[in-house]
Amino acid sequence: MRTDSGVWLTVVAHMIVGVDEAGRGPLAGPVVAAAVLLCEGGIAGLDDSKKLSARRRGALESAIRAQCRWGIGEASVEEIDRINILQATFLAMTRAVEALGFEPAEVLVDGNRLPRWRYQARAIVGGDALHPCISAASILAKQHRDRLMIAAAQDYPAFGWESNMGYGTAQHLAALRRHGPTPHHRTSFAPVAQLQLV
């Protein structure tokens, strides 16, 4: 494998990839997954993205992108509504792993459910706080999705997506009742679906 600013693990048996997602619960926006193969030696300070400040996440994201092999996958709002959020999450995870450009020896996934993959995989509850490769994936997934929602907020400022990232906060729900759903909303999610029945 190619060497850049980090030294890639070249032994197939060591190609253990971490996968995590961001955005299963929001009412708006895609679900995003990231897959990360850490460079040899790892990156100091990795942790569950939810436990890190925005500034720290940003610094770690830069290090991960520069020093690790990584892939990002998304499943759109349309895919979420068509196949459900769990299957859309698995689809995003699959796309993230495929974006790596190689077949890993094993994939460690945060959570208790796994996609149907041809390669070996393990679901690990709380894995984003236990395994650095999953921690790195959680950081990339959150940072990537946050940027998507901040960009979408420019077209729909009333919903406050630049701060709530599509989650059902009081501001978001009030704007949803006032303005109705946007193309970014998940119509299969109850708060949005109920408005469409009124």
Swiss-Prot record:
Record's catalysed reaction(s): Endonucleolytic cleavage to 5'-phosphomonoester
GO CC terms in record: cytoplasm; ribonuclease H2 complex
GO molecular function (one): RNA-DNA hybrid ribonuclease activity
Main location: cytoplasm
Compartment(s) where it occurs, according to its Swiss-Prot or TrEMBL record: Cytoplasm
Required co-factors: Mn(2+); Mg(2+)
UniProt keyword annotations, A-Z: Cytoplasm, Endonuclease, Hydrolase, Manganese, Metal-binding, Nuclease
GO biological process, one term: mismatch repair
InterPro entries: RNase_HII, RNase_HII/HIII, RNase_HII/HIII_dom, RNaseH-like_sf, RNaseH_sf
E.C. number: 3.1.26.4
Cofactor: how bound: Manganese or magnesium. Binds 1 divalent metal ion per monomer in the absence of substrate. May bind a second metal ion after substrate binding.
Keyword set includes Transport: no
Binding site residues for a divalent metal cation: D20, E21, D110
Ranges for domain RNase H type-2: 14-198
Keyword Lipoprotein: no
PANTHER family tied to this protein: RIBONUCLEASE H2 SUBUNIT A, RIBONUCLEASE HII
Family of the protein in this entry: Belongs to the RNase HII family.
Protein's job: Endonuclease that specifically degrades the RNA of RNA-DNA hybrids.
Name this polypeptide is given: Ribonuclease HII
Species of provenance: Sphingopyxis alaskensis (strain DSM 13593 / LMG 18877 / RB2256) (Sphingomonas alaskensis)
